[in-house]
Amino acid sequence: DEMYDSWSELLTELYVLNPELNIVFTVSPVRHAKDGLINNNQSKSRLFVLIERLKENFPLSYFPSYEIVVDALRDYRFYKKDMIHPNEQAVDFVWSHFVKTYYTETNMDLIKRISKLKSAKNHQIMNPDEIEGEKLKKWIFEERNKLNEEIGGNFNL
């Protein structure tokens, strides 16, 4: 099958580059109504079968965002007015399940630090020459450098 062969080739290359890679697949809960609901369901069914086949041969996981929205949040109050896209409440619900499933405490701490750093960077300093403004700029610089050392990259806001 063409889809399987393409994905298999890509995943093989990725795992050669990084054997510790954690790959998560999901199927979008958004309906592609413009293709017709029958075609949408057939397409998603093919994706489910593909992912199951890939899981048999590669160390990857599946996150059930489709199932959460379609089954757990099956009420249309969880959709936007177009009745196709999940609303903010549904997205938050799915995201909270994703975080509980895949994030470690270390990940969560890192996300909090990055959010705090982004907020500080976006803060409007009334008078940048004042001592408080200088302290904030210094803290942003130092915190960004600490993050770069910890994550081994070039973290830039």
Q: Language-model segments: which ranges?
A:
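N-terminal targeting/trafficking signals and adjacent low-complexity tails
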Residues: 66, 89-92
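Aromatic/hydrophobic pocket-lining residues that form the small-molecule binding cavity
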Residues: 3, 7, 47, 91
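Active-site segments of SGNH/GDSL-like serine hydrolases
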Residues: 12-41, 114-121
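Non-catalytic scaffold segments within catalytic domains of secreted glycoside hydrolases
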Residues: 35-56, 79-80, 84
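Extracellular serine-dependent O-acyl
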Residues: 22-24, 45-75, 97, 111-113
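Secondary-structure boundary elements
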Residues: 2-24, 56-59
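Hydrophobic/aromatic-lined pockets within catalytic cores
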Residues: 11-15, 19, 31, 52-55, ...
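Conserved catalytic region of serine esterases and O-acyltransferases that act on ester linkages
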Residues: 58, 81-82, 92, 96-157
